[in-house]
């Protein structure tokens, strides 16, 4: 069964081919990719390598984690699997303080770590104004980024209508 490995802290100069070359020593690769910014085409500093078997993936993790590739000490571990029919990417939207998730975005565009379109106030309504997403236009979230509340200052008080579209991307349930 295929096993997907996350490779983080990549050099901006690491390409799909150089990533494959470094990992192919440890087994048969079925897929490999360095994630790139959709606007600039530049590496986002992480990628994924899929091995044919779990044993090959484990061998690569043991051998390459904290080793140098293209001048950077890379981090290698098993990729987080998403349940089938899950949230479609990102971290599943931000819920309000009381667990409400009535109008929340359900993650970017189904990519790797896509940001939701807006943040919610307690009660299930989204905050108005600002541009709270951090990953471009609902794109890929770089590991280590933590979602922040607010756009241009303190969170809005009270409740308003849910944000509709705008730069936040898709604002419905992604099922």
Swiss-Prot record:
A Pfam match: RRM_1
Q: Which SMART domains match?
A: RRM (SM00360)
What does the UniProt entry report for the null mutant?
Answer: In the yeast form, results in slower proliferation as well as increased cell size. Does not cause an increased amount of bipolar cells and leads to significantly longer hyphae and empty sections at the basal pole.
Q: Which organism is it from?
A: Mycosarcoma maydis
Asked if the Swiss-Prot or TrEMBL record annotates the protein with the keyword Cytoplasm, the reply is no
- Locate the compositionally biased regions of type Gly residues: 132-141, 163-175
**Function per UniProt:** Component of endosomal mRNA transport that regulates polarity of the infectious hyphae by transporting a broad spectrum of cargo mRNAs from the nucleus to cell poles.
Q: Which family does it belong to?
A: Belongs to the glycine-rich RNA-binding protein family.
Kindly indicate whether the keyword Transport belongs to this entry: yes
Q: Subunit composition?
A: Part of large ribonucleoprotein complexes (mRNPs) containing RNA-binding proteins RRM4 and PAB1, endosome-binding protein UPA1, core scaffold protein UPA2 and associated factor GRP1.
Name assigned to this protein? Glycine-rich RNA-binding protein 1
Q: Where is the composition biased (Low complexity)?
A: 122-131, 142-162
Location within or outside the cell? Endosome
UniProt entry keywords in alphabetical sequence = Endosome, mRNA transport, RNA-binding, Transport
Q: Name one GO cellular component term.
A: endosome
Q: What is its main location?
A: other
GO molecular function per UniProt: RNA binding
Enumerate the spans annotated as RRM domain: 3-81
**Which InterPro entries has this protein been placed in?**
Nucleotide-bd_a/b_plait_sf, RBD_domain_sf, RRM2_NsCP33-like, RRM_dom, SLIRP/GR-RBP-like
Question: Which BP terms from GO are recorded?
Answer: mRNA transport
Q: Where is this region: Disordered?
A: 114-175
């Amino acid at each position: 069964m295929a096993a997907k490995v996350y490779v983080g802290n990549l050099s901006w100069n690491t390409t799909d081919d150089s990533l494959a070359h470094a990992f192919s020593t440890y087994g048969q690769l079925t897929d490999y990719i360095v994630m790139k910014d959709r606007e600039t085409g530049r590496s986002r500093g992480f990628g994924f390598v899929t091995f044919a078997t779990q044993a090959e993936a484990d061998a690569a993790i043991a051998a390459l984690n904290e080793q140098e590739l293209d001048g950077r000490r890379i981090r290698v571990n098993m990729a987080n699997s998403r349940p089938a029919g899950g949230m479609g990417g990102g971290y599943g939207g931000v819920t309000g303080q009381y667990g409400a998730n009535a109008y929340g975005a359900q993650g970017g565009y189904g990519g790797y770590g896509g940001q939701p379109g807006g943040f919610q106030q307690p009660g299930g309504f989204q905050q108005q104004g600002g541009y709270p997403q951090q990953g471009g236009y609902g794109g890929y979230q770089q590991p280590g980024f933590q979602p922040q509340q607010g756009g241009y200052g303190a969170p809005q008080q009270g409740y308003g209508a849910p944000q509709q579209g705008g730069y936040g991307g898709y604002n419905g349930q992604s099922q």
